[in-house]
């Protein structure tokens, strides 16, 4: 039996109370929560609520990820200490999670004494096991800020295609990867200074040790997701290949984080202490509530431990984290569940289009957070597939499913029951075949939730809602109410409808807990659990007056949401411009900090003759596929009106799924000299637009001509 099959069986027929620790990835404490983040927290929260409704002992743990160079520099930019920054962001994050009903048992911070002690103890245990190595490495160093620079804090000219303002490890124009030392005209993003090379002692976790490889090969066999297992096997390679590399776990001062014991001026890399933050947050909860922390995290513990993450951090959670735990004397995760990314209207979230939607803007615009919980759940399954928030579909699905199908059932029956029957159901109606069918379906729906097949659970629920509405339409209680002789039939119809509504509310409770709470108050019943499927409404407990449970989504609300996030971008741009002006003044006053002209002569006008040298052609994308081994590249097969198609590698993977591009027309540079790349020969370049500051305004957009253009046409 597979791990996913076992999960389904446990959901349908829980054998006693289980002890379960659940985490979501820790949000980084230098920005706002947006709807892309919420996919994961909503997914985890639904699973946690499902388990709680079985009566299991479940703890859902979270924290802000608070250490690292970006935090330190962001705080400096805002005139704050790092501690002041992370305290403010923690308050904002906690507010957003509360708004969306994310039910953490503890939401903490990695900048805590518990995390420092646990991180040190894990490090010292790994050191004792002979799994920590010391090495001298050469790095880029900012002579003005007197700090070593991570690759992403260096920019310059791509050594391959000569695009300007590219990061120190890869080019987002041509997709090439390279060493920071190969970058042309490099400069520090922090100060503008030209980096120098300096050596420094660093500390490494010896993941290449045969003990780690042997352990991970065994551990990977228990992963529930085939995609994760395949990726792990790709990273591990075949037996004897030794593909695992040692992991640099240290950073040099100045750095906001925990100093490594016995290594003054050296700090734990944020990715070492961040996952330890799961345990630190749980330990904080345990100490406040008298829970035996060690019983949950020691080897051989009967407690279960699950991590929900995005697929982009699978590497850290399925290689480093379990190996760190195994060789430091802790239990290892029971499983890791990864999800895909979120697109909005089929494209990467964009600040310029207003689709980079923050959690707070959603709330401020007046949208119901349970609408989004429902929509995401309807799209989620147990795989790593990306999901799309189509705003038109969002409006239509919420209005149809939740208002038209679900809420409508109660509103059609409650008034008659209160007016004609003192709010009391007909007990004999609780045995109606339709009620029995819904009651029997609850175990299947609960099993789908625990198997993380939320879309399947909700499809099943809405199919049942359709049957209930068909029953009401056929019985026509509004007609029955016209004749007192139909009182018994009317009573039965209303009673069946409301018991069906109770069962549908039970099925929807993990997704829409606030609506479920209102339903519980309406019926005057205790909080619903899965076992309550067998406890129908009773004439002994009259229902309360019906209160409207949910409004429809208005298109104007969606328009206001997009506008609010576009306005937010404009405010950011104004602030960035002011900051940029100040930075320019600072750079001017310090000549040695001035980079070699990044733009300089390149900004000078060119002649029409220069432009005429570039052969721009319309190209049709006839095939497109991801490039295995590259996080940035797509391989395009282009029809440019020649006898043969062209093969082009383009660094646009972050913005498009391959299937989105097939059949589209675009513009390519047709006379660019072919370039041999690691993955094959690239015979040109497709053109894409992006903002100057891609961090402030992320997004890549290929150029598309108007209809009528044909492959091979010149762009003049």
From Swiss-Prot:
Ranges of residues in domain tRNA-binding: 610-716
Principal location listed in the UniProt entry: cytoplasm
Cofactor note: Binds 1 zinc ion per subunit.
Cofactor: Zn(2+)
Catalytic reaction list: tRNA(Met) + L-methionine + ATP = L-methionyl-tRNA(Met) + AMP + diphosphate
Any one GO cellular component localisation term in the record: cytosol
Residues that hold Zn(2+) according to the record: 158, 161, 171, 174
InterPro entries: aa-tRNA-synth_I_CS, Anticodon_Met, M/V/L/I-tRNA-synth_anticd-bd, Met-tRNA-synth_bsu_C, Met-tRNA_ligase_1, Met-tRNA_synth, Methionyl/Leucyl_tRNA_Synth, MetRS_core
UniProt keyword list: Aminoacyl-tRNA synthetase, ATP-binding, Cytoplasm, Ligase, Metal-binding, Nucleotide-binding, Protein biosynthesis, RNA-binding, tRNA-binding, Zinc
GO molecular function annotations of the record: ATP binding; metal ion binding; methionine-tRNA ligase activity; tRNA binding
Motif ('KMSKS' region): 348-352
UniProt cross-references to HAMAP family, sorted A to Z: Met_tRNA_synth_type1
Quaternary organization: Homodimer.
Name of this protein: Methionine--tRNA ligase
Lineage summary: Bacteria, Pseudomonadati, Pseudomonadota, Betaproteobacteria, Burkholderiales
